[in-house]
Each structure stands twice: as structure tokens, then as C-alpha cells.
């Protein structure tokens, strides 16, 4: 029990075919045409398009370093007509790696109760925290189950991407709604995968720490390399991403064209920030999915591109050195 929260497994928990399936079907089960849903911008695409597919109207809530996200959330509620029915959150964030503390969720739950809004929280990166940071669960807030549900996936913590296994916990009415629509759409997750997942969750947890350390080392190598190349970044304290502001000399290109340039000229694949929302167009997302050697190769490619463009005086390449 990682968070000290007791749940009724029959009424307050349901297995999903990964978080993405659960999120999409939950929105189909609970949203109607014309409902308003609050979604951070930038955000993971299913948080946006799951609601759109269900027929709801999206109200983007700006989530950038220049603003206080909670204040933006309050303002969006005040200015929304009709009143929002649901808000979709995900911390640590994909793509921005933004993190919150438990007090943030306490305020969210209070806000949701005040305005009668459902809260859906995607806790995909629960265990991928660095430098002592531990991601909180919204379920730790007393009374959260009155208004909220939370998704967890085994893809990241247990390196089980592709197995398509996760679960949703929290509000019993939302759990029941998801169970009903899933009874029409699928027959559940393949039983051997569920058995393997139980073993993973209940067995020794050293593997989770190994995965976390692997991502932390990759983060360190990439962050060190980008900073050495003259590309200032905010070093994330969680998730498997680095959300990097496009260097000033390339800002006018926008994230899509800059991502193409990196792919063609540096042989480095990143996700353009525009794919996560309008407010993401000033950034690109690096995913820490390659090993440290490949990350160092990527940094060298970026440095070479900067050299050819004559923009930066790149120091001696130290990306082959270890990170202390």
C-alpha cells in the first residue's frame, strides 16, 4: 500500500486495458454533447481528444511556467458557461514534467466539491521521480473519492509498456460507469497479463527502483549534454521527459518545423510541442527512452547542427564522460 489509502476492490477499483483505454471509455460513459471539460494546455492528447470524441467541449487551461496553474483553473471555472462537468489532470505531467504536491490536490478537491465538478487524474508516472521527489496521489486527500478517480498504469513503473494493463480507482459511481461501458466494448484484459500484474504489484519492488534510477541517469546525461551545447533547460524532477524550450535563434520556426530540422540535420527525434496544445508550440519534448550511449549520440548530433548554423561556440565534447 504505497499511499495508505483503503479502497473497496469491488466498488472503487477496475482493471483497464492500459490508462488510455480507460480514460477514453470513461469519457464516453460520463460526458454528453455540450458538456464542458477543463484540460491543461499543453496536455497528453487522450486527455483532450477523449473528451472531444465523447462530444464534449474543451476549455483549455494554460499550464506554462509563466502562470500559476491553479489560478488559471479557478479562472476557467468562473468564466465557463455552462459550468464544467469534469477536469482532466495528470501529474507528473506529460509532456511538461510539471509536478505538484499534496496541497495542490487538497485545493483541487475542495474546488471540485464547491463547483460540483468531477476530477480525473492520470498518475502514469507515480514512481518516476528524481532527487527525492515522490508524486502524491489525489486519493490521499480525505473525501477525494466523492469527486475524483485516478488512473495508474504498469507501463512505466514496471517497464510493461505494450502489455496494456492498468487500473482506475476512486469514486464508485464513475467506476460503475466505466464497468458498464467496458462490458459492451471489451471482455477485459487477458487473464495471464492480470496475473503477471498482480505478481508485479505484490512482489519485491526493487525493479521499480531500478527503472526509476535508469530514467534518472538518462535524464542526467541528456540534461548535461544539452546545457553543454548551450541549450538551457529546466531539469525535470519526475516523468520520463525533458520539456525543452526551443533555443531563441530557432523560436520563429515553431515546434513542428524545429522538430523536423532536428530529425533531418541532427538525426534526433523529438515531439513538437504543438502536438500537445497551442501553448506547447515554444517547446519540444525529449523522451528518455534510449540508453545513455544513444543519448550521447543524440547530443553530439545536436551540437553538430548548432556548429553548422554558426549560432553557438560549442565547448569540448564531454558527452562520453560519465555523469557524477
Can you say where each PLM-predicted feature lies in the sequence?
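PLP-dependent class I/II
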Residues: 2, 6-324
Amino acid at each position: 500500500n504505497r499511499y495508505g489509502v483503503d479502497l473497496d476492490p469491488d466498488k472503487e477499483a477496475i482493471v483497464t486495458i492500459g490508462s488510455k483505454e480507460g480514460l477514453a471509455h470513461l469519457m464516453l460513459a460520463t460526458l454528453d454533447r455540450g458538456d464542458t471539460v477543463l484540460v491543461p494546455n499543453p496536455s497528453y492528447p487522450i486527455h483532450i481528444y477523449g473528451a472531444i470524441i465523447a462530444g464534449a467541449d474543451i476549455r483549455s487551461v494554460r499550464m506554462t511556467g509563466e502562470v500559476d496553474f491553479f489560478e488559471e483553473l479557478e479562472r476557467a471555472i468562473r468564466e465557463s458557461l455552462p459550468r464544467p462537468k469534469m477536469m482532466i489532470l495528470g501529474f507528473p505531467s506529460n509532456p511538461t514534467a510539471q509536478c505538484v504536491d499534496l496541497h495542490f490536490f487538497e485545493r483541487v478537491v475542495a474546488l471540485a466539491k464547491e463547483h460540483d465538478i468531477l476530477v480525473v487524474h492520470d498518475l502514469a508516472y507515480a514512481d518516476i521521480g528524481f532527487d527525492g521527489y515522490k508524486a502524491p496521489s489525489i486519493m490521499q486527500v480525505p473525501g477525494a473519492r466523492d469527486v475524483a478517480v485516478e488512473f495508474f498504469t504498469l507501463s512505466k513503473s514496471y517497464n510493461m509498456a505494450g502489455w496494456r494493463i492498468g487500473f482506475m480507482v476512486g469514486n464508485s459511481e464513475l467506476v460503475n460507469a466505466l464497468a458498464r461501458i467496458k462490458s459492451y466494448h471489451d471482455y477485459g484484459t487477458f487473464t495471464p497479463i492480470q496475473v503477471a500484474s498482480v505478481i508485479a504489484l505484490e512482489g519485491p519492488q526493487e525493479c521499480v527502483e531500478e527503472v526509476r534510477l535508469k530514467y534518472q541517469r538518462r535524464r542526467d546525461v541528456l540534461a548535461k549534454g544539452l546545457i553543454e551545447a548551450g541549450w538551457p533547460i529546466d531539469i525535470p524532477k519526475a516523468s520520463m521527459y525533458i520539456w525543452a524550450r526551443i533555443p531563441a535563434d530557432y523560436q520563429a520556426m515553431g515546434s513542428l518545423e524545429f522538430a523536423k530540422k532536428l530529425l533531418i540535420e541532427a538525426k534526433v527525434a523529438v515531439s513538437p510541442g504543438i502536438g500537445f496544445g497551442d501553448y506547447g508550440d515554444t517547446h519540444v519534448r525529449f523522451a528518455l527512452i534510449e540508453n545513455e550511449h544513444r543519448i550521447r549520440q543524440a547530443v553530439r548530433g545536436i551540437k553538430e547542427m548548432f556548429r553548422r548554423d554558426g549560432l553557438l561556440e560549442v565547448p569540448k565534447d564531454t558527452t562520453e564522460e560519465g555523469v557524477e
